[in-house]
Amino acid sequence: MLTKPDRKAIRAKRRRRVRNKILGTAARPRLNVFRSLNNMYAQLIDDETGVTVVAASTLSPELKETFKNGGNVEAAKAVGDLVGKLALEKGIKEVVFDRAGYLYHGRVKALAEAAREAGLDF
């Protein structure tokens, strides 16, 4: 009998494999994306020092009142735009995109494209 694959385990395996290959620096931090059922989170992380340089989410004060549900494509676009603007304010233009094992589709894709439109290069 065939068993259904555990999607969370597959994502975790993909995440570990990718994280071994990418590294964020002070000059080019890692743009990490986390997707929960009701919210989207994005961080720029300098892995050399272990510091989060910029963070944005649907729970950020700038966006919290805008969306009733932060777990949709429109909210992801807003988070991508916000993280891009905050990064440019800190003088960061180039990042390494870390989709954290999520497929490049839907909310993850919308966040990435909005960050690119805001001025980030990856």
Curated annotation (Swiss-Prot):
One of its GO terms (biological process) is translation. Gene3D superfamilies: 3.30.420.100. One of its GO terms (cellular component) is cytosolic large ribosomal subunit. Keywords: Ribonucleoprotein, Ribosomal protein, RNA-binding, rRNA-binding. CDD domains: Ribosomal_L18_L5e. GO terms for molecular function: 5S rRNA binding; structural constituent of ribosome. The keyword Plastid does not apply. It comes from the Bacteria. Pfam families: Ribosomal_L18p. This is one of the proteins that bind and probably mediate the attachment of the 5S RNA into the large ribosomal subunit, where it forms part of the central protuberance. Part of the 50S ribosomal subunit; part of the 5S rRNA/L5/L18/L25 subcomplex. Contacts the 5S and 23S rRNAs. Belongs to the universal ribosomal protein uL18 family. HAMAP family: Ribosomal_uL18_B (MF_01337_B). This is Large ribosomal subunit protein uL18. It comes from Desulforamulus reducens (strain ATCC BAA-1160 / DSM 100696 / MI-1) (Desulfotomaculum reducens).
